[in-house]
Amino acid sequence: MLQKFQNHINANFGFLKDKKLLLAFSGGMDSMVLVHLFQKLNLNFALAHCNFQLRGAESDGDENFVAAYAKLNNIACFITKFDTSNYSKENKLSTQVAARNLRYNWFNEILEQEKFDYIVTAHHADDVAETFMINLSRGTGLDGLTGIPSQNGNIIRPMLPFSRKEIENYVLENKLKWREDSSNASDKYLRNKIRHHIIPVFKEINESFLQSFQNTLEHLNQEQSLINDAVQMVYEKVVSEENQQLKINISALLHYKNHKAYLYQWLNKYGFSAWNDVYNLIEAQSGKQI
């Protein structure tokens, strides 16, 4: 895996070699492998660990493990604690969403204060498949089915081509120690249900499921790019932006056969959910602007 990872970095992330990187390090298997690989490649990085205080002594054990590893390997390390439960209640968020918000807000604070260039996370191929299934089960457009991007602004995910099985093998080959999150064994969370019960069925049907899945995502991303070009072209003809408002020329929009699809692409990012009401309003306003 080391050689494959090095080739992947050289081909797709060569720009990281002279950058200052912040690695998200939970102490779990995936991030442990990422840290070890970055050490092998002699990249310039520090570690960042969040103690979300959701698992009592186990969370503190993760923090202690990370701190000890950083000290032993002479790696700079940033550690913080969050009252995640209280934050999620105050902001009416699920625990997972609350933890994500706290995590990335803090990472970005470190980037700004300490002049890091990128955040690096250990998401891998199985994570992408799980996210696809989650979005599919909840209902989504093509955007929700095109996977986790390898780069999203200042967030880098260099392990996306690698499967959980490859990561497990790397741990065994290099005799790495890591921390197991006990919540990963529970089916309380949808992601875990999919990981434990759905993905294994696909792998049983097709031993090369993850590779086939990645090929499919590549095709979907290419098609999404074509759609984005078409959506932008129609947007420029139909929509005007005035005083931070969008004005849609309904007559012009209805000229296009797939006007509902264009509308979805333009407005979905604003959190619309009652799409039937929106579509009915559009058709009722034919010849006008909204």
Give, region by region, the residue ranges found by the protein language model.
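Hydrophobic residues in alpha-helical segments
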Residues: L136-S137, K203, I282-Q285
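AMP-forming adenylation/ATP pyrophosphatase catalytic core
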Residues: L2-D30, A46-C50, F82, L102, ...
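Contiguous mid-protein beta-loop-alpha structural module that forms a pocket-lining wall or clamp
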Residues: I156-L253
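Core alpha/beta nucleotide-donor-binding catalytic domains of modification enzymes
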Residues: M1-I199
